[in-house]
Swiss-Prot record:
Cofactor(s) the protein needs: heme
Xref: Gene3D superfamilies: 2.40.50.100, Cytochrome f large domain, Single helix bin
Source taxonomy: Bacteria, Bacillati, Cyanobacteriota, Cyanophyceae, Synechococcales
Superkingdom of source: Bacteria
Organism: Prochlorococcus marinus (strain MIT 9301)
Membrane-crossing segments per the record: 284-304
Entry note: cofactor: Binds 1 heme group covalently.
Membrane topology: Single-pass membrane protein
Protein name: Cytochrome f
Molecular function terms from GO: electron transfer activity; heme binding; iron ion binding
Name of the gene this protein is made from: petA
GO CC annotation terms, alphabetical: plasma membrane-derived thylakoid membrane
Length: 317
């Protein structure tokens, strides 16, 4: 009964997210998206066999992502995995309609099997305050160890706190104490390529052929058509959407691959790996006992040395 209830809640959450996504596009087209939604729809796992997180397939620019994870944690305990997505304050980028919009951010944390998002009833007051306004989702119903966040307003969410619950090997023999790896990705801004392979307007547009620019047509929506005349007299047309700025003019000679526009992108994606040790309480107790033993041994050696010195002094040695 509990499992059925959880499934219903997950499906309801996914449905609500989808509605929010669609309504955002329809009613707020100027917003710039850093949606993990696309990866969830197109990839079974967000991490390829090569180790690359799939967000990098659409977000081609690289920018740093920083993660802070405890060196070790106890079993069945809640800890914080902090993802930092740095960029300059008040940075703007080109939206889908060509207007300037604030950057948004998104992040994905791939936890080891058995680790998962901590239930809210176990969040501390500090965690509740740090995660206010942040909505966490699982990558899929089958993968509750992969947590996705975003899109969020970037200027107020450059640091995202993920509350994580560790497994308890004493109650579940599938998990073991030891060192585990986490895979983390953070993104700011729009991608350069859509999952379909089509370019967004947040990328450099280049010429597909060599020749002379015959003419440039400005379309009503603000986009352009660049007509290039090849050496054989054939005319090819390059479509440039609204947003990027042209850096060429009529009668310019260009080669295939030369840029026609500036690079409007100011965002980027970054990923990294981190490690955490699931610490056995018995190991901690053993370590404490070891240190106590070492301390007692040193004390006994000092006492023995003093005793020997007293005997030697009494015997006149």
């Amino acid at each position: 009964m509990k499992g059925l209830k959880n499934q219903i809640m997950k499906k309801t959450s996914l449905f609500i997210c989808t509605l929010l996504f669609i309504s955002s596009i329809v009613f707020h087209p100027k917003i710039t998206f850093a949606y993990p939604f696309w990866a969830q729809q197109n990839y079974e796992s967000p991490r390829e066999a090569t180790g690359k997180i799939v967000c990098a397939n659409c977000h081609l620019a690289q920018m740093p992502t920083i993660a802070e994870v405890p060196q070790s944690v106890g079993a069945d305990s809640v800890f914080k995995a902090v993802v930092k997505i740095p960029y300059k304050n008040d940075l703007k980028e080109i939206g889908a309609d060509g207007s300037e919009v604030p950057l948004q951010v998104g992040a994905v944390v791939m936890l080891p099997d058995g680790f998962k998002l901590a239930p809210q009833e176990r969040w501390t007051e500090e965690i509740k305050k740090e995660t206010e306004g942040v909505y966490f989702t699982n990558y899929s119903e089958e993968k509750d160890n992969i947590i996705v966040v975003g899109p969020l307003p970037g200027d107020t969410n450059k640091e995202i706190v993920f509350p994580v619950l560790s497994p308890d090997p004493s109650t579940n023999k599938e998990y073991h104490y030891g060192k585990y790896s986490l895979h983390i990705g953070g993104n700011r801004g729009r991608g350069q390529v859509y999952p379909t392979g089509d370019k967004s307007n947040n990328v450099v547009f280049t010429s597909s052929s060599s020749g002379t620019i015959n003419s440039i047509e400005t379309i009503e929506d603000g986009s352009y058509k660049v007509n290039i005349e090849k050496e054989n007299g054939e005319i090819t047309t390059e479509a440039v959407p609204v947003g990027p700025q042209l850096i060429v003019k009529a009668q310019d000679k260009i080669n295939a691959g030369d840029p026609l526009t500036n690079d409007p992108n100011v965002g980027g994606f970054g990923q990294l790996d981190a490690e955490v040790v699931l610490q056995s309480p018995y190991r901690v107790i053993g370590l404490i006992a070891f240190f106590i033993g070492v301390g007692l041994t040193q004390i006994l050696l000092v006492l023995k040395k003093k005793q020997v010195e007293k005997v030697q002094a009494a015997e006149g040695i």
